């Protein structure tokens, strides 16, 4: 049973400066999925891609990578994982100095636009998608959505995250 997983994250602004996570932008999208997200031998993973991120806009920074939260004080809720952002991930550990981390903006995502009722649509999409066949009966993913824009842009922008599963035997939810 093949399932397509589409990860989208919009508006991952910053974590508190106290979190002091570290970020790594050196891993490929394939390495992020194989070595960070799908650990061990629990699934067969194919067709890993990032069809939209800051690289497509030629902005000179990375909007995805890995993070390590094991040395953070206070303790960060996750030891590590994948980070998807609407700005450069290098801004995440200490916070964005201004609200222009995603400037100039790059394209949004049509799938997410169809799911939300945002009149202006989406922008600054960072997407990782892949197909996987689980070798277990149950799967789970932990995630955290953070935004430094919320207090400033309430009712102006919708910081949005979507975890979309599709494929045989999966009904639209």
Predicted features, each with a name:
Residues 1-25:
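Bacterial Sec-dependent N-terminal signal peptides
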